[in-house]
Design a protein with these regions (language model features):
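Glycine-centered hinge/linker elements that transmit conformational signals in sensory
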Residues: 204-206, 246-277
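Hinge/lid segment of periplasmic solute-binding proteins
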Residues: 51, 121-176, 201, 228-230, ...
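Conserved N-terminal structural module of periplasmic/extracytoplasmic solute-binding proteins
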Residues: 8, 20-133, 145-150, 193, ...
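Extracytoplasmic/periplasmic solute-binding protein
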Residues: 162-171, 177, 201-249, 292
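Conserved C-terminal helix/tail region of periplasmic/extracytoplasmic solute-binding proteins
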Residues: 38-39, 43-46, 187, 387, ...
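Short, solvent-exposed loop/beta-turn-alpha elements that line the ligand-binding surface or hinge
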Residues: 137-152, 219, 236-259, 307-309, ...
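Long, aromatic- and glycine/proline-rich binding clefts that accommodate carbohydrate-like moieties
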Residues: 157, 311, 360-413, 442
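Extracytoplasmic/periplasmic substrate-binding proteins
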Residues: 62, 75-76, 80, 125, ...
Length: 442
């Protein structure tokens, strides 16, 4: 091979190598990664502002009409003056003597849903229903703090006590045995209020002849008939034998009970025919309007008259002169009260002098305390104060002071039949059996 041929081949190899390099893709430079970002510190968490629990106070009662509602609202007003940040829940259930409220309360208590405090009659209704069954807190410390042992009468202290402890705070004293009448009707006819049962029946005949219903009765729920019966019982047998009915010392099969039933049967001949459809305050309206001459009911009628602007009312003991059939509204502290602290302050208001002086003139009752100013009370309540101090005090049947709630219910059942059939023998047998079933009579 010639030298020229060799150089030609070498030149060709060089050219081909150059072409291969030129055709090779240009490498993309690897980008330099950016510097790692400095981690951002999370801001310090600020805890949410806690929302304070709303302060409430639930009071359960059956005070829905006239003076009783006004008195309750006055107590609420006093409470909110001291504790303006507390919302008061007024849990009322309408129905005189708690006829509708008591079953509603029982359902709540047994279901573990107690109100903060509730209205309950002093005596067996309180003790037998709620204390012995373990649903209430004792209030001994509160009584000592407030000095109540020095201002509540001894008899009242005894009735709110059980097993050496105080269980409720009495806010008032009521009298059940009052005959209320329309003064204008009486004066226009020259009538005088009757003080004995014989005088009552003589006057009732005169009223009937004039076209006036002699006795207004509103016994929807039947308790008002039981109320009427307790007044007749006390007037027939006197204070000691009457009290003996509730201890087993007076025989329910005895002649005095029979006489009382006969008197009541006769009295029922003079009542308004629609009595079973009316409440006690609607019956009182018949007296206010002059359609009826009289009604036998507790002294809450005084508050009803005040609320309705009726000033022509008179009163007399219907065959029970010298006897004071007493009852008291109280408030207690149930175990598990949702707002216990507020409930205790409520009880302080109920037992205070200021609370009782504000409440009772409106309610138509007198103070349970013995240091209230009598000048704050109207004419009737002043006489009630005098009678409370000197009369024989006996407990009310219809309003839970004399008998247990279950016993009262049995007597109400007897009265339900009696106001319809007026069967004295059957009613007396039923009353005697009720005493046995209550465990008091043998």
């Amino acid at each position: 091979m010639s030298r020229r041929t060799i150089w030609s081949m070498l030149s060709l190899v060089v050219v081909l190598a150059m072409l291969l390099v030129a055709c090779k893709p240009t490498p993309t430079p690897t980008p330099t990664p950016p510097p790692a970002a400095k981690p951002t510190e999370a801001p310090t968490a600020v805890p949410p502002t806690p929302v304070p629990e709303k302060k409430q106070l639930e009071i359960f009662s059956w005070w829905t009409t006239g003076g009783e509602a006004a008195g309750l609202l006055k107590l609420f007003e006093l409470y909110n003056q001291k504790f303006p940040d507390v919302e008061i829940i007024n849990a009322t259930v309408a129905g005189g003597a708690g006829f509708e409220a008591k079953p509603a309360l029982k359902a709540r208590m047994l279901g573990g849903d107690p109100p903060d405090s509730f209205q309950v009659h002093m005596g067996h209704e309180l003790i037998d229903t709620w204390v012995t069954t373990g649903y209430m807190e004792p209030l001994d410390d509160l009584y000592k703090q407030e000095g109540w042992e020095a201002v509540f009468p001894k008899g009242v202290l005894e009735i709110v006590s059980y097993d050496g402890h105080y269980w409720s705070v009495p806010v008032n004293i009521h009298r059940s045995n009052v005959l209320w009448y329309n003064k204008k009707v009486f004066e226009a006819n020259g009538w005088k209020p009757p003080e004995t049962f014989d005088e009552f029946f003589a006057l009732a005949e005169q009223m009937k002849a004039k076209g006036i219903t002699p006795l207004a009765l509103g016994d929807v729920g039947i308790w008002a008939s039981t109320h009427l019966f307790e007044v007749i019982l006390a007037g027939t047998m006197g204070p000691e034998k009457y009290k003996g009915l509730w201890t087993g010392q007076t025989d329910w099969n005895g002649p005095e009970v029979k006489q009382a039933l006969e008197t009541m049967a006769k009295m029922l001949e003079y009542v308004n025919p629609d009595h079973s459809a009316l409440s006690w305050d609607q019956a009182n309206d018949l007296v206010i309007q002059g359609k009826a001459g009289m009604t036998i009911m507790g002294d809450w009628v005084d508050a009803d008259n005040l609320a309705k602007g009726f000033q022509d009312s008179g009163w007399a003991p219907p065959g029970t002169k010298g006897i004071f059939i007493a009852l008291s509204d109280t408030f207690g502290l149930p175990k598990g009260a949702p707002h216990r602290e507020q409930a205790i302050e409520w009880l302080r208001i109920c037992g205070s002098k200021a609370g009782q002086e504000a409440f009772n003139p409106l309610k138509g009752s007198i103070c349970a305390r013995n240091d209230c100013n009598p000048e704050l009370f109207g004419p009737y309540l002043k006489t009630a104060m005098d009678d409370w101090a000197k009369d024989a005090i006996v407990p009310s049947l219809a309003h839970g002071a004399a008998a247990s709630e279950s016993w009262v219910t049995m007597i109400n059942d007897v009265m339900t039949a009696f106001v319809t059939d007026k069967d004295v023998a059957k009613a007396q047998a039923g009353l005697a059996q009720a005493c046995k079933d209550a465990g008091v009579c043998k």
